[in-house]
């Protein structure tokens, strides 16, 4: 059975992402930190890890990108998870809600909902953790914001679904593992590089992709740790590194860059439009 490590308690959105990618029968391994995910995969305790790398509203998750640079694991896949926040209570305690607990980011993403109802927001260490703690120690007038999976895991009641302020709230995850993933018909490639601190160096580096018609879907700079005011550049592009024009672009980049690290070529997640259509079809069948 496949074992996948994730950060958080059982019922976390990261565990939901694991189930979406690997199926409901996957065995999941909760980890306290992102570092523990990488350690679990490297030690063989888990086959893969699911690491959040980007949120459609909050942007990139820098810690994850730093760990991808520091470790030798490869990206084996990506997951695009629609994050739907739900208001959960202990069954039988659906009276007046005065206080809502959750992770600070979840509270921020539901700020308008909470303000309209004049609910006091109380930060908690984890969305699923807030559900776990409330189930263990029920408190009158207290609810939590978490996933429907957390409600199932801890036996809580969903009072209201989809309370997030922005409905198109997605988190992108990388599936990390050892070795190279099998090649797929629709691939993406992620890499990181640095260029010499000279005029035009970044322009010429990116030109290796442009002249070969390689489509870059993401370009982001990050500070190089222990090297003030020096930067590395993270790139996502369409295609597999073994495709002739992409491998030629990477060879050209190697000749211009101070260093290049290939994070992996992996199956791309289904486009959001397809997921939206599938979701609408499912609603019509209800």
Predicted regions and their residues:
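Domain-level signature for soluble enzymes in the chorismate/prephenate branch of the shikimate pathway
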Residues: 1-286
């Amino acid at each position: 059975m496949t074992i996948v490590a994730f950060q958080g308690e059982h019922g976390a959105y990261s565990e939901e992402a694991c189930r979406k990618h690997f199926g409901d029968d996957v065995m999941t391994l909760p980890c306290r930190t992102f570092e523990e995910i990488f350690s679990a995969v490297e030690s063989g305790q888990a086959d893969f890890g699911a690491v959040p790398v980007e949120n459609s509203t909050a942007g990139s998750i820098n810690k994850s990108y730093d760990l991808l640079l520091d470790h030798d694991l490869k990206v084996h896949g990506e997951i695009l998870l629609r994050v739907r926040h739900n208001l959960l209570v202990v069954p039988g305690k659906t009276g007046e809600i005065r206080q809502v607990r959750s992770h600070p980011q979840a509270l921020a993403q539901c700020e308008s909902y909470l303000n309209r109802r004049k609910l006091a927001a109380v930060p908690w260490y984890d969305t699923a953790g807030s559900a776990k703690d409330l189930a263990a120690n029920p408190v009158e007038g207290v609810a939590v914001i978490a996933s429907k999976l957390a409600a199932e895991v801890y036996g809580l009641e969903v009072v209201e679904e989809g309370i997030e302020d922005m409905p198109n709230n997605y988190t992108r995850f990388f599936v990390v593992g050892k070795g190279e993933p099998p090649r797929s018909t629709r691939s993406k490639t992620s890499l990181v590089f640095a260029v010499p601190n000279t005029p035009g160096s970044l322009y010429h580096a990116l030109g290796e992709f442009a002249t070969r018609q390689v489509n870059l879907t993401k370009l982001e700079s990050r500070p190089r740790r222990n090297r003030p005011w020096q930067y590395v550049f993270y790139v996502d592009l369409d295609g597999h590194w073994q495709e002739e024009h992409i491998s030629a672009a990477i060879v050209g980049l190697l000749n211009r860059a101070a260093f290049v690290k290939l994070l992996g070529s992996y199956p791309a997640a289904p486009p959001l439009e397809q997921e939206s259509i599938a979701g609408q079809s499912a609603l019509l069948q209800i």
